[in-house]
Amino acid sequence: MVQKSTIDFAKDLADHNTKAWVAANRDALNAARGDLLTLGLELIERADEYDPEIAQAGLEARHLTRYNRDPRFLHGKPPFRTDLDLFFNAGSGAERVGYNLHVEPGDCYAGASLFIPSPPALARMRDLNATRTDEWNRIISAKPFVAAFPNGIEAYAELKTAPRGYSVDHPAIAFLRMKGLGTRSKLTEHQVCADDLVDRLLPIFRAVKPMVTFLNTGA
């Protein structure tokens, strides 16, 4: 479960999104991050219930997204992110699709993603989609997948046309245009803070595991 204090911290940060406020509430920030790290450790410890590769990878619960934005990319946005994320995979972060939990007031979800892949990882995933399109379509149309992720595959960003080397008429063009992708199974704040959160997350991860395995082929 995620502690209610973690949700409350994210809400407070949204209302007081300044460097001075964060500096004055550093202990609350560290407690919120530590809360998600504890949850991440439990998810890794139970990985044999959804992905044996994760279970065998010897991971640590240390894969939290940085909470602060890079000032080079602010463009008028608040200085700090108001979400906390767990992300873990069985390899390099930018090379392999992994499982994730996103905790943000009013927008909590779980699934799998590689929203900002390295160029080689993106090229590899595009090649998989282009050359094994039928297999890909079977994975994302499977009943457990559709039930868990009614919005299907979501793009982090996408090209306006086909990537170099691919036809705009390719049957997988919708996915080939994606520059990063993920799935989202929506969760309420009540569900995120409930004692049975991990038991709720396991079937979500099991539903997306075939996608994870497919997109990590050759990684």
Please give the residue ranges for each predicted region.
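Phosphate-proximal small/polar/acidic motifs at interfaces that engage nucleotide phosphates
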Residues: V22
